[in-house]
Design a protein with these regions (language model features):
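Short catalytic/metal-binding and nucleic-acid-binding patches
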Residues: 1-188
Length: 188
C-alpha cells in the first residue's frame, strides 16, 4: 500500500460526553520543573482551583514534579471544557515557573491523555491507582503521607469500610503510561 497514514503528534481527545474521566498530564521531556516544594504546592493548588472554576468534581488527584493524574466527574454539560481548563492550568504554571527560572517562553508542558471511565471496576481501580501513586513512585511508604494527593482527604472523608474497600481494589491491571520515575527528582 502506497498511501501513508499520518501519525498524530498528540492523542485524539474525544470529549463530548459528560462522565467520569481519568486524566494524566506531563511536563515537556518529563523535566521536574515542579520539584521544589513551593513549586509543587503552586501546581497542586492550581489544579484544585481550575477544577473548581470549570465545575469538574475531583474524586482523586496526585501531583508530582513532572506529571499529575486525576479522576474527576465532568460538568453535566459535558467534558468539552477539559482542554480549556488544562490550558489555563498549564499556561499559568508555565509562565510562573519560567519567570522563577528566568527562561521566558520555555516549553514546560507536553500534553495530556484522558480516558472516560464507564465501568465501575475501571473507576475504582483508577481511583485507588491515583491515591496510591506516590507510593508507586517510591516517594512515601504510605499514600496519606504525600501532601499533594487526595489520599489523606479521602481517608478523612470516607468511612473506614470505604477506605478498606478502596485500598483493596487491585491496580496491577490498570493500563496507564506512567514512566516518569527516573525524571521525577531534581536534576541539580
Amino acid at each position: 500500500m502506497d498511501a501513508e497514514i499520518p501519525w498524530p503528534r498528540s492523542p485524539l481527545h474525544r470529549l463530548a460526553a459528560a462522565g467520569t474521566y481519568f486524566v494524566t498530564a506531563g511536563t515537556y521531556l518529563k523535566k521536574p520543573w515542579f520539584a521544589e516544594r513551593r513549586r509543587l504546592e503552586v501546581l497542586h493548588r492550581g489544579l484544585l482551583k481550575v477544577a473548581d472554576e470549570f465545575a469538574w468534581h475531583l474524586q482523586a488527584w496526585a501531583v508530582f514534579s513532572n506529571h499529575y493524574h486525576f479522576v474527576a466527574h465532568s460538568p453535566e454539560s459535558g467534558a468539552k471544557s477539559l482542554p480549556k481548563m488544562l490550558g489555563k492550568l498549564h499556561g499559568k504554571t508555565a509562565v510562573w515557573v519560567n519567570k522563577l527560572d528566568q527562561t521566558p517562553g520555555r516549553k514546560v508542558w507536553y500534553n495530556y491523555r484522558e480516558t472516560i471511565l464507564d465501568h465501575e471496576g475501571s473507576y475504582l481501580a483508577r481511583l485507588n491507582y491515583v491515591h496510591q501513586n506516590a507510593v508507586h513512585h517510591g516517594l512515601v511508604p504510605v499514600a496519606n503521607q504525600y501532601p499533594c494527593c487526595s489520599a489523606r482527604w479521602f481517608e478523612k472523608a470516607a468511612t473506614p469500610a470505604q477506605v478498606a474497600m478502596m485500598y483493596a481494589v487491585k491496580t496491577d491491571r490498570v493500563n496507564v503510561i506512567d514512566d516518569f520515575d527516573d525524571k521525577m527528582r531534581s536534576e541539580g
